[in-house]
Design a protein with these regions (language model features):
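Edge beta-strands of jelly-roll/beta-sandwich modules across compartments, strongly enriched
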Residues: 95, 132-145
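Short, surface-exposed beta-strand/strand-loop-strand elements in extracellular ectodomains
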Residues: 91-106
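A short beta-strand element within beta-rich, extracytoplasmic domains
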Residues: 80-90
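Short, aromatic- and glycine-rich surface loops/edge beta-strands on solvent-exposed regions
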Residues: 126-131
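Transition segment at domain starts
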Residues: 16-74
Length: 145
């Protein structure tokens, strides 16, 4: 079992929430940005916990303010099917979680939504990214194969 806790307090410049306090959708980032490897990120107050045991990964990623894109999990399995359960709670700003494999967006999970889905595994790596624009957000995930 691997358990990681981290706390990050950094001073940084953030992307302004230009679509208002009641709209949590991304206003600045487009799909090509997500696939283009824009991974620079400004984060404040990050608390992360995760565990991987055999064919299962679980975790929580909580940040008081994030602007940019950060990878929160990478999962690989030799099983035929992988099941993802991802919950995104955004209190401020804009946020989106994307699952990417082989430079393709597999799923998008919008702010304040929960989604369970399965993928047919092709022995690829599946990466979960959090994208935020001045977002206060918590992501919880459970992956099983």
């Amino acid at each position: 079992m691997l358990l990681i806790f981290s706390l990050t307090l950094t001073s940084c410049s953030h992307i302004e929430d230009i679509n208002g306090p009641d709209d949590y959708s991304l206003a600045t980032f487009k799909d090509e940005d997500l696939l283009g490897g824009i991974h620079s990120c400004s984060e404040m107050g990050v608390i992360e916990s995760s565990s991987k045991i055999l064919d299962k990964a679980t975790g929580t990623y909580k940040v008081s303010k994030i602007s940019g894109m950060t990878e929160i999990e990478e999962y690989r399995s030799n099983k035929d099917t992988i099941t993802f359960n991802i919950e995104v709670k955004c209190e401020e700003g804009n946020a989106l979680v994307v699952v990417i494999s082989n430079n393709e967006i597999i799923k998008k999970i919008e702010a304040n939504q929960s989604l369970t889905f399965e993928v047919s595994n092709n022995d690829e790596s599946y990466r979960i990214f959090l994208v935020g624009e001045s977002a206060k957000v918590t992501v919880k995930y459970n992956i099983e194969s």
